[in-house]
Amino acid sequence: MKLVSITLMLLGSLAFLGADTAGPDTPSQFRKKWNKWALSRGKRELQASSSYPTGLADETTVPTQTLDPFLDEQNTTGPLQASNQSEAHIRVKRYRQSMNQGSRSNGCRFGTCTFQKLAHQIYQLTDKDKDGMAPRNKISPQGYGRRRRRSLLEVLRSRTVESSQEQTHTAPGPWAHISRLFRI
């Protein structure tokens, strides 16, 4: 009985852990990725050298075997190669355009931003009939904040009257300049 339970536990752990240990062949995956990267880089460099002639390299002098050293003869007929040079040029051009357009978008792409934009639009559509004026009782001279809304002429008159009264009655003391600062 003990042997059966140990065997079942061993088979269960082997079935559970066996999926991770029997992974795909990593050197072949590396070769495929390397070939794909080398081909795309070679196409870009080839296109750049043909569009900007520098005299250092020519299209005919660059062999394709130096670009991908792990390339087998059986992998050369795969879909990684472009059928003609114009398709490679289009792919390079699209790649460069996508790199330049990455910083163009300033908006937010999260769902919360969409919700905030929608709420703002609803607020704008429903509040068009409201006016931006303060209520009448707040605008009156007895309303809130009237001291801060006094006209400049009233402020200057009140300060000149107060300062002339102070100069005629008493000499300025040590606290006179502080009291002037706190007056409005």
UniProtKB/Swiss-Prot annotation:
Positions of region (Disordered): 130-149
Sites marked Required for CALCRL receptor interaction: 114, 123
Taxonomic path: Eukaryota, Metazoa, Chordata, Craniata, Vertebrata
Protein name from the UniProt record: Pro-adrenomedullin
Gene (UniProt): Adm
Major localization listed first in the record, in broad terms: secreted
Residues found modified as Tyrosine amide: 144
Family named by the database record: Belongs to the adrenomedullin family.
Organism, as annotated: Mus musculus (Mouse)
Cysteine pairings via disulfide bonds: 108-113
Keyword Phosphoprotein: no
GO molecular function, one term: hormone activity
Signal peptide span: 1-21
